[in-house]
Amino acid sequence: MIHQKGYQFLQIGLASPKQIRKWAERILPNGDVVGEVKEPHTLHYRNQKPEKDGLFCEKIFGPIKSGRCACGKYERIPEQGEGKKFCKKCWVEFTYSRVRRYRMGYISLGCPVAHVWYLKSTPSHIANLLGQKLKDIESLAYYNHCLGNPSTNYPTLLFIKKYFQYSSLAWLLHILLCFFSFKGFEALEDREIATGGDAIKRLLSELDLQNTIDESRKACEELAYFDPLDEKEAQKAQREKERLVRRIKIASYFQETKIKPQWMVLSTIPVLPPDLRPMIHLNDGPLATSDLNDLYRKVLYRNKTLWELRQGIWPAPHSLMISQKRLVQEAVDALIDNGLGGPPMRDSNNRPYKSLSDVISGKQGRFRQNLLGKRVDYSGRSVIVVGPHLKIYQCGLPKNMAIELFQPFLIHYMINKKLASNLRVAKSIIQSKHPIVWFILKEVIKKHPVLLNRAPTLHRLGIQAFQPILVEGKAILLHPLVCAGFNADFDGDQMAVHVPLSPESQKEARLIMISNRNLLSPATGDPITLPSQDMLLGLYMLTLEDLQRNFSFSQKQCLKKHTNFNQMPSFISFEDVIKARVERKIHLYTSLWLKLKNIEAITSYLYQSPIEIQYNSRGTRSITYEDWNICENIEGEKISIYAYTTVGRVIFNQQFRSALQKRIDY
């Protein structure tokens, strides 16, 4: 049990065999030590009671019914401080049945086995740390190859070194077995050769981490001065450099956390509490069981057979021992991560078993479903829709959601301002949705940010703070620029709203988590608030020249611009264009001529050829280009300049200039 005041953080890492035993072992009043699961049995087929020393043993994990032992005897559960009570016959503790949710057991393996996460993951941590090929380490772990002269402290008899195939030495081992007793042969074999998890454990235990780091750094420095002759050598050098960097990182992690590398090889495996892998009686009779129970049983069956072969009176054939050790390794692999790096272990219905990795990983796993996916007070959830009128640091919060989330703050405000005499009166006013409630709610949320979160929260931009704005409806309004950080779009995505309660959390939300302070990607440093999807499509539609583009651009210029200058609508300001659109005299895609104020700033027409020049009786002339119409007097001075544009482009230009001016003034 984790106490909120006793522990400030939770660290996940490798556990030593001693630590695993410490989790499970308990000393009974008669001096017996319990905790080790020895039998592969679960429940007795007749009375459906847990088997002794099995996977559901009450002596190890606690009683099934509170205060009742395995014999059926009932006693009062002692209070805290009174001391523990045990049945003198079956030695089951009289306690609550909920202890079966956290009491663990362990299995003592007959041979060391390599942890499949560190052996077969990509990249392999064991192979990387030892500086060996993954193929060689896997062959060693699964007893296809042997390691000669595993320890350099003693003179050897067989004079063999490094890796060799087991079958090439099987005949010699068979002859030696005839001249030695079984115990003597085991001692000789341990000194001369090693294979399986035992060989990997010896290599890891003899590893000097600091020396490994120094050698890898020296090799990296040599590669930095290496001048490759061709691209193939350059790629090979780059791969070697990446491998050395990974090796330095892994060795440094082991040093910093004070974890020993040999703990990646298991000699003891923990057994989950029985209530986390239950067996349930169905109405029609059969038992429904967790896949973990079947996987634990496979490990126990194979491990028990191995112990019997090792402790037998007559020595077992060496090939049989090797085969049984390989079976134990495969069973433990399936228990930890079924199907990693090979075909999965299946049940009678040809369905792959769900291993420990499957139980804790993914959306339905223990972490995301049960630990991180809990319901939280002062939180809500709704569909997100686009809010283009919002600032980047604002979000639209539905009124009905806001009145529930901020209800404690509303009650506090009403009682302080003497608007309600007590809690009950304040709640009744809020439930009646009196007009004053909306006024108070607006005042409350002005100084109170909210947190928006979209699952899965894969990086820190998955949860950001916003200033809420009350809106009608039931959907949360979100600025489209912040969608990239959440990896969200407006096709039905849902987001959760959380209210920070403490002053510290509110301060952190305003200063650190507010969306306008999270404009860069934490991974690459590139801008993450870039227009995309709906924004780009909206800008394209707004600035589109004509919805029916059935002929080329040059043809359109000839047909519309220089022939119809006087027939097309012309305006002298942005305001006149907006006014005409409001009055529905023109639509969004209407082409028009707009008079520009800054005449001298326009120079792009100098690079174009005039399409048409018109003279009038006063001596002035009108020159029409592809995008401009310039009126000049007799001296050649510009009188006016008109730009060819559309209503949508005028709106875009006005909004862009307005936003830019506000930024400059700020």
Swiss-Prot record:
Name the UniProt record assigns to this protein: DNA-directed RNA polymerase subunit beta'
Cellular component terms (Gene Ontology): chloroplast; DNA-directed RNA polymerase complex; mitochondrion
Subcellular location per the Swiss-Prot or TrEMBL entry: Plastid, Chloroplast
A Pfam family recorded for this sequence: RNA_pol_Rpb1_2
Record key words, sorted: Chloroplast, DNA-directed RNA polymerase, Magnesium, Metal-binding, Nucleotidyltransferase, Plastid, Transcription, Transferase, Zinc
Catalytic activity field: RNA(n) + a ribonucleoside 5'-triphosphate = RNA(n+1) + diphosphate
SUBUNIT field: In plastids the minimal PEP RNA polymerase catalytic core is composed of four subunits: alpha, beta, beta', and beta''. When a (nuclear-encoded) sigma factor is associated with the core the holoenzyme is formed, which can initiate transcription.
Domain of life: Eukaryota
